Amino acid sequence: MVKSHIGGWILVLFVAAWSDIGLCKKRPKPGGGWNTGGSRYPGQGSPGGNRYPPQGGGGWGQPHGGGWGQPHGGGWGQPHGGGWGQPHGGGGWGQGGGSHGQWNKPSKPKTNMKHVAGAAAAGAVVGGLGGYMLGSAMSRPLIHFGSDYEDRYYRENMYRYPNQVYYRPVDQYSNQNSFVHDCVNITVKQHTVTTTTKGENFTETDVKMIERVVEQMCITQYQKEYEAYAQRGASVILFSSPPVILLISFLLFLIVG
């Protein structure tokens, strides 16, 4: 008899909890969409020019805090604590620990599992780019540029344009336009520098098309990140609502008691 009363109270509390959750305020949907009209960014419209000037005082091809091709804390080709052909710690080959003919082997670096899990969950953080993350690869969008020549040129050269974008977490921006503007700036800058370093140059038509392609991908990336961010917030609200807390506390009381 007592067990039936306890089961009835648990059922009542469970129904009350879900009824309270159903009355929660619905989250707003992000604005904007694919190719919804004219450009939303100032400074566009100049033929052949870059419509997204880089911010923060850095020039094209200069990452934050250092020059391209310069690693942190040392030059290329210089290992830590010794020269090439020498093991760590200053010992010579074949001299190790008092035994004859042993090779001194450098210790293997330990993998930080927290960093691996964070990169898998939110995208890889790009070193030297001020905390930007690299999004997953996308299919390049089909875009019409208003002329047969440009449409054909885009179809023939789209493989030369980026299919991933750099971005920061959406909670660092007040709206979609700010996210997309910053995303386009850093992605176009990084792709242009990387490609020109390999000896390939872009024409004015290429720059125009790269900006359009990257803009569409940045909008898609924002919508994806915003939805994931909203779902995480909904989970926090779910488990922090008073009825759910009361139900969990009651169940723990029954288990412990």
From Swiss-Prot:
Organism name: Sus scrofa
Domain of life (superkingdom): Eukaryota
Assembly, per entry: Monomer and homodimer. Has a tendency to aggregate into amyloid fibrils containing a cross-beta spine, formed by a steric zipper of superposed beta-strands. Soluble oligomers may represent an intermediate stage on the path to fibril formation. Copper binding may promote oligomerization. Interacts with GRB2, APP, ERI3/PRNPIP and SYN1. Mislocalized cytosolically exposed PrP interacts with MGRN1; this interaction alters MGRN1 subcellular location and causes lysosomal enlargement. Interacts with KIAA1191.
GO BP of this protein: cellular response to amyloid-beta; cellular response to copper ion; intracellular signal transduction; positive regulation of calcium-mediated signaling; positive regulation of glutamate receptor signaling pathway; positive regulation of neuron apoptotic process; protein destabilization; protein homooligomerization
The entry's keywords: Amyloid, Cell membrane, Copper, Disulfide bond, Glycoprotein, Golgi apparatus, GPI-anchor, Lipoprotein, Membrane, Metal-binding, Prion, Repeat, Signal, Zinc
Keyword Glycoprotein: yes
Secretion signal span: 1-24
Function noted in UniProt: Its primary physiological function is unclear. Has cytoprotective activity against internal or environmental stresses. May play a role in neuronal development and synaptic plasticity. May be required for neuronal myelin sheath maintenance. May play a role in iron uptake and iron homeostasis. Soluble oligomers are toxic to cultured neuroblastoma cells and induce apoptosis (in vitro). Association with GPC1 (via its heparan sulfate chains) targets PRNP to lipid rafts. Also provides Cu(2+) or Zn(2+) for the ascorbate-mediated GPC1 deaminase degradation of its heparan sulfate side chains.
Glycan-bearing residues: N185, N201
Pfam families membership: Prion, Prion_bPrPp, Prion_octapep
Record protein name field: Major prion protein
Residues reported in the UniProt entry to bind Cu(2+) 4: H88, G90, G91
Sequence segments annotated as region (5 X 8 AA tandem repeats of P-H-G-G-G-W-G-Q): 54-95
GO cellular component, one term: Golgi apparatus
Region (Interaction with GRB2, ERI3 and SYN1): 25-234
Any GO MF annotation of the entry: identical protein binding
Sequence-type repeats, residues: 54-62, 63-70, 71-78, 79-86, 87-95
